[in-house]
């Protein structure tokens, strides 16, 4: 059991921790990439993720997305309805990374007309009650493009691949995992009918150093310099993969980072906050909520915080 208690301002809703005490020792023995992958998946399962060991192709992924969206929206698609939903909105052939990011952050609800004429809002995400979103993990997903690739570990939210994790064995430079992400971006992530265009975050790790960064098409944001370590509220870095998993990959934390602490801005750039920015935002929002009961004041304060933090990107 990990002691990761007392978030800042002593609120259980905060995700930047003031205190984090792991009860394991950092391994100093040799760990292959496969060892890291198996340990990561087991740790995620222990934290409540559903592991889908046989989901490794596009057909299986689409079937799972259908199941998860039906559960989230309390609806059932007929085969023709589902095909129409996918082809005309969820995975339009003309969509690229920018359009998919907009569907996650701005246009996450779609007014769908069923064959019997009824209209219902279909949500990709529940942004109000984030723990209603189903979190799953898969490994070794195979996808063709200009080259065929097989991805290490992918985190699905309501069936959609939103986080891609690439691992290298301990001792290998983490930049190799970073370079691999960019090779996949060129070769297969963004290929035709690829749901990996929905990716929002990348995580790279060699076991001893773990970093995250946003999926963006902006070349100046595509640098290794924009990768970030997770951290505690005093800016102590959380670098080892096991510690990163126990903190950043807690479902409540990851969903908050994806939904509340990532910004798709007016220049169509996807930005994700650094830990100190999130900590500052959480403090301000907590003070606003403590002082006012008006929901609109909370929303206004949150918008102000996002704007204020642009200077730090």
Curated annotation (Swiss-Prot):
Deletion consequences: Manifests the latent anticodon nuclease (prrC, ACNase).
Catalytic reaction annotation: Endonucleolytic cleavage of DNA to give random double-stranded fragments with terminal 5'-phosphates, ATP is simultaneously hydrolyzed
Subunit record text: The type I restriction/modification system is composed of three polypeptides R, M and S; the restriction enzyme has stoichiometry R(2)M(2)S(1) while the methyltransferase is M(2)S(1).
Key words, A-Z: ATP-binding, DNA-binding, Endonuclease, Hydrolase, Nuclease, Nucleotide-binding, Restriction system
Record's protein name: Type I restriction enzyme EcoprrI endonuclease subunit
EC number: 3.1.21.3
Family, as annotated: Belongs to the HsdR family.
Gene Ontology process terms (BP): DNA restriction-modification system
PANTHER family xrefs: TYPE I RESTRICTION ENZYME ENDONUCLEASE SUBUNIT, TYPE I SITE-SPECIFIC DEOXYRIBONUCLEASE PROTEIN SUBUNIT M AND R
Role this protein plays: The subtype C restriction (R) subunit of a type I restriction enzyme that recognizes 5'-CCAN(7)RTGC-3' and cleaves a random distance away. The R subunit is required for both endonuclease and ATPase activities but not for modification. Cleaves only non-methylated DNA, hemi-methylated and fully methylated DNA are not substrates. After locating a non-methylated recognition site, the enzyme complex serves as a molecular motor that translocates DNA in an ATP-dependent manner until a collision occurs that triggers cleavage.
Taxonomic superkingdom: Bacteria
Database matches in Pfam families: HSDR_N
Broadest EC class assigned to this enzyme: hydrolase
Claim: Hydrolase is one of the keywords in the record: yes
GO molecular function: ATP binding; DNA binding; type I site-specific deoxyribonuclease activity
